Amino acid sequence: MLKLTKKADYGLIALKHLAVHQAGVPATVRSCSAKDIAESYGIPLPLLSKILQKLAKAGFLRSEHGTNGGYLLARDPRDITALEVIRLIDGPIFLTSCFTEHGMCSHSERCSVREPLRKVHEGILRLLSNITILDMTHDDPAPAGIPPEQLYELGGGLIAPGLRNKTI
């Protein structure tokens, strides 16, 4: 089953938290400590600290030292995608062994589902690359506020035609 690790989940939560926090406060108090974020969501502080350090090293966050120190977004939340964050924290995303770096499995020559699974794989990557941290700040029941018909397009036609007009 395709599933985000807790680390990737926590990274996305922290980035969303910082985006919301920075939007609602004066520039002088925009940073947020790892401890504050960890306590807000019940995330283990040592684990979150490592994730935030990784995000800072990759240029997603900036860390400020001192009494009012903490973390700030280093990039606009409109420019940070879920795919970038997940790849940074979890590494490459592979739906099946067909799509690993080696791209082969013992059934490659006679596989009848490789092409349909490739479409699913590409659709997932496309969808994740179209969801930004800013999108995540909107409390909308649809993923990133994307209507089902647009999910169909972003996913490369992966949603069954009967679901196109239904709320997901």
Model-derived features with residue positions:
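N-terminal helix-turn-helix DNA-binding core of bacterial DNA-binding proteins
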Residues: 2, 6, 12-43, 62
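Basic amphipathic alpha-helical segments that dock to polyanions
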Residues: 18, 51-56
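Alpha-helical residues within the helix-turn-helix
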Residues: 39, 56-57
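Key DNA-contact positions within bacterial/archaeal DNA-binding proteins
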Residues: 46
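Residue cluster at the C-terminal edge of the helix-turn-helix DNA-binding motif
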Residues: 57-60, 88
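Beta-hairpin "wing" of winged helix-turn-helix
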Residues: 59-73
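Conserved segment of winged-helix/HTH DNA-binding domains
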Residues: 77-102, 117-122
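C-terminal regulatory/oligomerization modules of transcriptional regulators
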Residues: 102-168
